[in-house]
A protein has these predicted regions:
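A glycine-rich (often HGG/GG-containing) alpha/beta subdomain
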Residues: 1-150
Length: 150
């Protein structure tokens, strides 16, 4: 990851892929709020919501067609996991809805996060220590290898 990519706005599914009741898409970076606003019906709410607060709205496409009912939570810098503005969009877990939301976010200016990029940003912004980052990496590796329960 180059230094220039540290300033990009990124998005990623933060819940396991596949069928589920709820999926959470995370968006972080300097344009996270502006990009997320392009994908919801209540654009004013995202700009006025206090950090840590949530609101109900709809994900809409470029033509303002309804895609899904969602809960949006806004975390304002520096009071987020990454230390940057961060938005969580809690949507239904349909793979079609997740794919549509991801496409909307990308077409609005976000790029897909690299593996571990949210945690790298948290480390680079002083939100977690190197020891915490290394522990997180080891835990994920164990989960992937099946040696640790979720």
């Amino acid at each position: 990851m180059s230094l220039t990519t540290l300033h990009d706005t990124i998005c990623a599914l933060s819940t396991p892929p596949g069928k589920s009741a709820i999926a959470v898409m995370r968006i972080t970076g300097s344009d996270a709020i502006k990009i997320s606003a392009k994908c919801i019906s209540d654009t004013d709410k995202i700009f006025t919501t206090r950090g840590g607060d949530s609101f109900y709205t709809n994900v809409v496409d470029e033509n303002k067609n309804h895609i899904d009912d969602v809960i949006v939570t806004v975390f304002r810098a520096p009071y987020s996991y990454t230390g940057e503005d961060l938005v969580e969009i809690h949507t239904h877990g349909s793979t079609l809805i997740i794919d549509l939301l991801q496409h909307l976010l990308q077409s609005s200016g976000a790029r897909l996060a690299e593996a571990g990029e949210f945690s790298r940003r948290a480390y680079m912004n002083g939100k977690i220590s190197l020891q915490e980052l290394e522990t997180l990496v080891l835990r994920i590796q164990r989960q992937v290898m099946g040696t640790e329960a979720f």
